[in-house]
């Protein structure tokens, strides 16, 4: 579990149920894509990344993925397919490191 405190609000999230975080166009807004639900947080990816462990990887400026929920990586098209069939983009400079991390897991 991870706890986020934003002003008066506390949000508890089960890290294992999170597939990825996605930055929205609005400043300091992030969608948490979960196995069961999606919620919007008033935070930055950097704020979230600092609270998470090694099971999450920032694969693109707009995405922070849960490595345990990755089903497949299409290296040619730089697409991550998650266990729930959602997809994320992998930044070109992040692809090789992500593949190394997955091979070690």
Where in this protein do the model-derived segments appear?
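Inter-domain helical "communication" segments and dimerization helices
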Residues: 1-3, 96, 101-105
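Conserved binding/recognition cores within well-folded domains
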Residues: 1-83
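Flexible domain-boundary/linker segments
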Residues: 35, 65, 87-90, 102
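Generic solvent-exposed, charged/amphipathic alpha-helical segments
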Residues: 46-49, 95, 99
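C-terminal structural segments of small proteins and small subunits
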Residues: 77-98
